[in-house]
């Protein structure tokens, strides 16, 4: 009996398990069937949409096919029309070209006739102008020959003038004056032309130029010339005699001593004198040295220095440098003096400004005391009177007077060291 009950229980359990498994399996299959049905429905919908799109695309293809056939027909028609128009245009151009050729031939004939007539007129006019210009040129050549003859006579006259001692000397003086003016030196300040002086023996001397150099130095220039310097012929002997005579006369004049004596009498202080013998050209210097190789040694022995324009310009450049440097030094001293005066003026202004500051401080302090007394004594009574019913009319009364105070503080002086301090030596 118990075994039968156990068997029955086991069978029931198995049946229950099978029923539960069958139920679960059935439920699962239902779900899968429902899911597949939904997918099938969705696929059918998609197929329906795709069929609709297919029909729409087929319609578009048919429409495009019709359009293509229509355009092909239009192209064929346009090509046919173009060929016909090209044929007609070709015929029209042929006729037009024929007419235009006839017109151009006629115009060319007319232009040839006109150009020939115009060319004949231009040739006639040009021939007339050429003849008139030729006549004018012949006249000008004749006048030019006369001018050349006059110029030749003028050149001969100038040459004769230069060959004379007076003319040669004048040329040398003019050259010297032009060099001095172009050197940058100031006339009547740095140099004097044709300075006349009288020696103690009542002998009058007139050097061509005197240049005032710094440190009590003088440069005396006396221009010398000879007709043999401009003469094209070889006159070495005469040139040597003439220049030796000039050197001797210049040394006998003793410019140095007489100029120092004369200028020192006029409250000037000069110590040294440099005497230059100026020759008008460098060729003149070469001629003098070629005529007398010992001329320079003789001149240097007499403390006289012969120079041409180039040598004189070099010495004037050095002189200008010395004069400019000396003028800069003098201006430097003047600047130092003016700076001292400026510093003194700044000190005076500082004293006055300090006094003004004190006065301003006193004024503000007194005003502040007045405003305090006014607000405390007078304005309190005014407010009491206004409370009693007496007003000021149209004029508004101030509540109080503003008070001011001055705060005095010492300024901080910021000292900055210069990168390259310059020491001024007095």
Curated annotation (Swiss-Prot):
Keyword Signal tagged: no
Gene Ontology process terms (BP): DNA recombination
Pfam families linked to this entry: RmuC
Matches recorded under InterPro entries: DNA_recombination_RmuC
UniProt feature coiled coil, ranges: 25-85
Disulphide bridges, residue numbers: none
Keywords for this protein: Coiled coil, DNA recombination
Similarity comment: Belongs to the RmuC family.
Function: Involved in DNA recombination.
Protein name, entry field: DNA recombination protein RmuC homolog
Organism: Rickettsia prowazekii (strain Madrid E)
Gene (name only): rmuC
